[in-house]
Amino acid sequence: MTILNHTLGFPRVGLRRELKKAQESYWAGNSTREELLAVGRELRARHWDQQKQAGIDLLPVGDFAWYDHVLTTSLLLGNVPPRHQNKDGSVDIDTLFRIGRGRAPTGEPAAAAEMTKWFNTNYHYMVPEFVKGQQFKLTWTQLLEEVDEAQALGHKVKPVLLGPVTYLWLGKVKGEQFDRLSLLNDILPVYQQVLAELAKRGIEWVQIDEPALVLELPQAWLDAYKPAYDALQGQVKLLLTTYFEGVTPNLDTITALPVQGLHVDLVHGKDDVAELHKRLPSDWLLSAGLINGRNVWRADLTEKYAQIKDIVGKRDLWVASSCSLLHSPIDLSVETRLDAEVKSWFAFALQKCHELSLLRDALNSGDTAALAEWSAPIQARRHSTRVHNPAVEKRLAAITAQDSQRANVYEVRAEAQRARFKLPAWPTTTIGSFPQTTEIRTLRLDFKKGNLDANNYRTGIAEHIKQAIVEQERLGLDVLVHGEAERNDMVEYFGEHLDGFVFTQNGWVQSYGSRCVKPPIVIGDVSRPAPITVEWAKYAQSLTDKPVKGMLTGPVTILCWSFPREDVSRETIAKQIALALRDEVADLEAAGIGIIQIDEPALREGLPLRRSDWDAYLQWGVEAFRINAAVAKDDTQIHTHMCYCEFNDIMDSIAALDADVITIETSRSDMELLESFEEFDYPNEIGPGVYDIHSPNVPSVEWIEALLKKAAKRIPAERLWVNPDCGLKTRGWPETRAALANMVQAAQNLRRG
């Protein structure tokens, strides 16, 4: 029983983000389709070769995607929304990009598919759309072509396919409502056809991803698995693949399926290996997801060995990454600026492949010397002074309930704030950022590269802040912002100014399409060595008599958009960040800043996959926000900003944040989101976004007025604010000026009644 290793998928973008550059060049019309396809071929060949060189036995094929793998599956099944279809029904790479980016075959704008988070990761997928009576057929054969490609290169491959039940679960019904699960029998023949084609190519194992099996699924969905897999059995061996959580609660459903193996995430799940071994059919292969595919930390392989060794020789066993390595940067070896000690604690995708090879070899031979050697740095980290800051740990331990309570209730605070700011009815503001022009980006880049000294950099930033204030005063906004010219990214900026974080040069991870992010890494206890935003906020406030908002990114968002430590809980990290930012609130207040916004766009997306785990998360998430904000005096107004499409299931927690004002994204849902706030009888002030900043379209005064009147039917007008639905960083100045002028005019019209 020789143990093999495999990965569930590999990063697609390339070490130097070659895929991103090729996509954007093609979209801009600067390169041909052939040139784009050639970059894809080159990247796939390189990535298979790199995994093989690192000792991976079975290489994943089908993990590459031109936009995202769920969209690839939609095209495979011929599921193209009518507005994006070619007249002759054909499907090509442009069809795929149109669904992702929003264009009709004629070149006219046509709404892109909705995009949402892939389970609880920071990766996104395009949501499949289903209509009643829909037909499916094998249409886009990218998977089969890539299998041919890999086999021609002499590789031993394992195709990767998103499973039928999870695919339907991830989609949404459009138009007349019906149960999308009823489409299962219509898509199964396409899956049968794909598996038959793979069998023809001599494929032994297919990795069929059903991550929905880690969720608390409705019974009807659990019941759908057996007939689905009865229909798919027999052509090739199926490795039923789950990740991001454990499978024990759904194990009875799983063990009844006619598959030949099961992959489980032994990093994020709480499944017990001995229990799994006992309950799985004895002839099944177990793929043990022991190496974390979602983080950047070197594994303690001695621990991983101990976790699995008792079942070695008792059943067929593979060792694997917990999930696809898509969520990890590619290669640590190109990081030249990381301190040697810190660098020794990390492993990126290629290093994780090496870990899988070390683990496989040790399990096959019983010789663990190499594991001990590999694990030494991560074991030494436990005692590093870079990790532990006694002052932070002491302060965290001393938190009391009082630390998360404002001095008085909202009604008392609102009176103090009205007396201080004397704002008109329908007060106008923006969410924080203004257009990041080429000049601003060049200024920051020159400073970062050392081509510009600190004095000239500061003079340049001050000039852009001054311009933002002048623009806002000219437009007649009531509460101003400094525009965030000095910030590259709302999380990275704070991470760079807090102790306990490090940054990589090339640690890029795909978010969706061509968008990549470079998350900060939390390596130790978090603290604030010096004020972060105070100087620029104070400068902006000195330029105007109107209030200027201080702008902070909240603790839960900083946590969710970073690679967290693995040696303490997420709650601990969030509260450490909250304490650091609490001091920032106090300093902003002392500097005369009376309105402070703490953005928490990630509060909802941090929710655990299982609803039964939500309460615990929301409790500490809300507490972290309140620790951050509660130091503010009554007449300091705390704002928060959130952008999601779903509030009703967490309204209690939104209200529990106790922010004086919440601004939300509502324009795309035509104010329907406010229903949740109305039904809940939300007590504080609210700024429903009146226009969609993701679109270059300028909303008319009438359109904004109509939306605000609609909002006033749900929320008392005296508690409403007027604002766009998100920051304006990605927009140009001409449309920003035009849209804000119309927004201010609409508010003035409503004041006149």
From Swiss-Prot:
It comes from the Bacteria. It catalyses: 5-methyltetrahydropteroyltri-L-glutamate + L-homocysteine = tetrahydropteroyltri-L-glutamate + L-methionine. Binds 1 zinc ion per subunit. L-methionine binds at residues 431-433, 484, 599. The active site is at 694 (proton donor). L-homocysteine binds at residues 431-433, 484, 599. Its EC number is 2.1.1.14. Its cofactor is Zn(2+). Zn(2+) binds at residues 641, 643, 665, 726. Catalyzes the transfer of a methyl group from 5-methyltetrahydrofolate to homocysteine resulting in methionine formation. This is 5-methyltetrahydropteroyltriglutamate--homocysteine methyltransferase.
